[in-house]
Every structure is written in C-alpha cells, then in structure tokens.
C-alpha cells in the first residue's frame, strides 16, 4: 500500500513538473509574440526568389545548383566506400566481438535517446503550433511543413550520429588489430579514414537536404522548411551532445569504481565497466560531436540564407548571393576530398613502411593543405560566379577574402592548440615538471596557467581575423 502511495505521489510530482513547464513555455511564447510587431514571423515568413532568373556561366542558378546534387551524391558515395572498406578490413575475432558489444551497447543508448527526443519534440511541436498557428495565424499547411521538417532535422542529426557510432566501432577494432605488427602508419590511416567518412557523409546529407528545399520546394514555403529543419537539428544535437557528455562521465566513474572495489586494472577484460566506459566514450566523443557538427553546418546555412534575404532587397542580387554561397559549400566538399587524397599519397609514400612516425605531422599537413586548396578555390569560384555583383566589379574578391579569413581560422586554431597540448610542447613539459617536482597542487596551477595562456592566444587570433574580415567588409 505504501509503495503504491509513493508511486502515485511520484507520478503526481512528474505531472506537476510537466504542467509547470508547459505553463512557463506558454507564457514565454505569448509574451514574446505580443512584444513583436504583427507582421513578424521570423525565418518562416521568408520567401525565396526565383533562382532561374539569373544566369551563371551561361547556366541559370537553378540548373547550376542541380549539378551540385551530383557532388552531394559523390560525397555520400565517398563516405559509404570508406565505410565498406573499414568493415572489410582484417580483424581478430575477439577484437571484433568486443567492438560489436560496444556497438550494441551504443545502439541501446541511441534507441533510448531516440525515445527521449520524440518526447522533447512533442513539447516543441506544441509550442510551434501555438506560436505559428494560433499567435501568428499561419495557415495549417505552413505549420504542418514546419513540424515535418523539424522531424527531418532531428532525423538528420540522429542518423549522422548513428552512422558515426557504426564507423567508429568498426575502426576501433581494425586499428587495434592493424597495430599488432608494430607499424605506425595503419594506426594513423584507419582512424583518419573513419573521420573522413563521417565528415563527408555529414556534409553531403546536410547539403542534399538544403539543396532539395532550395530547388524543389516553392519559394513561398521554403521559409517554413528552413526554420523547421533548423529547429529539429538543433533539438537533436542539443539532446545528443549534452546527454552524451553526461553518459560518458557516468560510465567513466562507474568503470573506475569497479576497478577500485575489485582491485583490477582499468582495461582488464574482467572489468565489465570497461565496456560501459568505451560506450560512454563513443557516446560523448562520437554521437555528440557528429550530431553537433550536422546542426552547426545546417543552422549556419539557414542563418546565411536569412541574412541574404533580409539584408538585400534586389531579388537578382539575392539569387547571385544564394547561388554563390551554395556553390562555395559544394566546392569546399570537393576541396576537402582532393586535399585528403593528396595528403594521403604523400603520407603513405613517407610513412608507409616507417617504424616510427609523428602522428601530428600528416594531420597538420592535411589541415593546411585543405585550407590552402579551399582558399584558392574560393577566389576562383567567386571570380566566375559573382564577377559583377550589383554593378560592383570588386565585390567578388572582397567576399572571397572574408570567407578566407574563416578558412584560415580553421588552420590556425589547431596550430595554437597544438602549441599547448602537443607531446613536443614546451608548456606540456612545464606542467609535467611542475607536477613531478611540486606535487598535484603545483601541477594544477601550471595547467591553469597554460590553459589561460592558450585561451589568450586563441582569442587574439580570432579578434585579429575578424578585424581583417571587417576591414574587407567596409571597403564598399
């Protein structure tokens, strides 16, 4: 009887909490809606111009972006090719069993997360209907499109995260087996291939969805599609990223407790916490970042589209900028693949039969090679796509220079991070020496100093690059 009352009380508290959350969301939504002018509708009210109204290199914008779909298919094929290659690499039966056990545990985690996401989506869907349907008086089809594409966004984040887990668990056991002969190159090559597979798949899926909206959805309904898609992928990424981080910490602590209680080594096969720890690491370091990367790439695209449509009034210039942005995104995909193949040919020739190698060297060269190829492609594509933007013959190189500042940031950040975290870093040596000579307290203080110092240089680099980009933007 007492148990029944406790359960009833617990259920009652849950209902009260959910009701309170709904009430808070209701009043926040109503308040924000009343505070805005009647014509507001955000991205959902945006209308796309006719992409076929402007020609580029003798081809209208719609047809040019249709060609971009082929590059997306290429990216998907590239990702699947590496996926199958990793799957078919030699692996010891025991190693495969462990990696499959980790994958099955990760799968259970993802299924649970999927159910949780659907519960969250139900709350968000109610707010979407309330805001757009009741307060903004959108037509039922328009609200339905927002809801449908929010599910598409969730499915995108969730699907990429699942693909990432599958690829990584393939790569884990194959890398371990490839390391047995003692050659370092396979230990570098297999994880890098797994990362390229996930990255190419992520970008290709994202581009495919956004190009589908641009090319096949009527302009009046593109806004609801984009805002729904952005809401969905943001929701999926937030849940998978945060929950994955929490899960990995809990699993790691659990594995350590098992190690202490039973006095066994952390990676001992007799410690079942090791599997939980490995699952947690995959959840925190694969599921979360994969979904987060998908969301970041997509939301950035939606923001760029919104900025162009709101900041530019001339439909012809809108079309030029929209086509240019997406052609640039497609070319970045091609540049990444090209740089990867060139870098791998160099790395294999240099380290293929080596007994020792610095793993940071080919990774650093890949980052810089990708950045250089991307910057060159940025200027070339900009020159041919937007040579004359609104009567200005100089805008193409100014916009290309602004994008190149962002590309350069992607190369500089790893260099600055490496200066404070590399095995050959002077700061790492200082932290080790401090901990060795002065104990834990001095080691912690030394680490804090190095961390703050690194944040200073990273921040300074970002401010410098943003200032340079701002100077280009002010040139007219």
What is each PLM-predicted segment?
Residues 3, 10-26, 30-476:
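Hydrophobic packing and interface segments
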